Amino acid sequence: ESKLSGIGNTDFMQEVWYHKSFKLNNSWKDKKIFIHFGGVDYKCDVFVNKTKVGSNIGGQAPFSIDISKAVNFTKNNDLIVYVIDERCPGSMNPSPWYKGRFTPKKIAIAKKWALDKRRTQPRGKQSSFLHSYQCVYTRTTGIWQTVWLEAADKKHIKSVSIVPNLKSSCFEFTPDFSANVNDNFKVDITFKNKKISSSIFNTKVKKIKIKIPKPKLWSIEQPNLYDFVFTLISEKNNKTLDRVKSYAGMRSIEIKKNKVYLNNKPLYQRLVLDQGFYPDGIWTAPTDKALKNDIILSMKAGFNGARLHEKVFEDRFHYWADK
C-alpha cells in the first residue's frame, strides 16, 4: 500500500506473493543458513526452490527459518513468500459520521468483510474501510520490515539474556546455544572502548554473573551503555565458532506505591503518543535516521519517553531509544 513500495495500491488485498532470486557464497557451505523476517503482516508461507521451509502467523513479531536443506550453491536460489492478510476483523456498525463520508456500497463491503472475520486477526490502527478515517489509517499488507540471510556454524549462539543487577553492581548473562555444546563461552565487556573485563566460562554454566567496578548508570539524561562481545570457542581446537555483539545499561526500574522508580529515584513519565505511521512508508520508516529523529524530536519537545500505540515497533527504534 505504501508509496515507498513502488506500488501504492490501497485497495483490500487478501493475498500477495513475493519472489526474489539470490546466490550464496561458497564460504557458507557446511553452515546453517537462516532467513530472518523483521515483520510480515499477517500469515505467511515461505518457499525456497519450490520447497516449503516454514510458516508464520503474526504481523508484527520477527521470525527466522532454517533454510539449509533447501538451498544450493551452484546456481540461483528462488525465494517465494505467500502472504494472507485477512483485513477488517470484527463487527462494524458505521456511525452517521462514517455514512457522511463513505457511500452505502463501500460501507456494505467493509461491513461484510468485518463480519466474516470474527476478530480472528488483530489490526491495530489499520483502517477497516478503503480509506483512513478518524484515528485509523491505511493498511499494511505483507513484508514491512527488513529481510536478511545469515550463515552460522552448526554450533552457534542463539541468544543471550542480559539482566543488570544494580544492588550487586553486576550483569547477569543467560546464554542459549543451538545444541547441547560442551565448549567455551567468552564474555568481553567494554565501556566507551575501554576494557572492563574479559572472562571465559564453560558452556554448561547456565547463568553467568560479572561484577562491574564503579558502574556508570543508564538514565534518560545520561544513557550510558556497556558493550559486550560474546564468543563461542571450540574446546577441541580453540576455533571461534560464533561471535555476537550486544550492549546493555546498568539500571534498575521498579514500581512502588503507584510510582515508577529509575535507579531508586522517582521518575515522572512525560510520554508522547507514538503510533508509528509514516506518510510514505505507513508502518515502515523510510530511513534509519527517521526512527532516530522521532525520538530526538519528542525529547526536544519536552518528553522523556513514548507510549508506543497499537504497534510492535522494530528493534532499531528501541536501539536508538537506548542510545
Language model features: what each stretch is:
Residues 92-93, 198-199, 243-248:
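Edge beta-strands of extracellular beta-sandwich domains
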Residues 8-9, 13-156, 180-181, 305-307, ...:
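Accessory beta-strand-rich segments of carbohydrate-active enzymes
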Residues 84-91, 233-241:
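Short acidic/polar inter-strand loop motif in beta-rich domains
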Residues 78-81, 222-234:
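Short, aromatic- and glycine-rich surface loops/edge beta-strands on solvent-exposed regions
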Residues 2-24, 28-36, 41-49, 54-57, ...:
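Active-site-adjacent substrate/metal-binding segments within catalytic domains
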Residues 46-48, 169-201, 206-208, 228:
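Beta-strand-rich binding/interaction modules
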Residues 151-181:
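Surface beta-strand/loop "capping" patches
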Residues 65-70, 209-223:
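Signal that preferentially marks extracellular ectodomain short beta-strand elements
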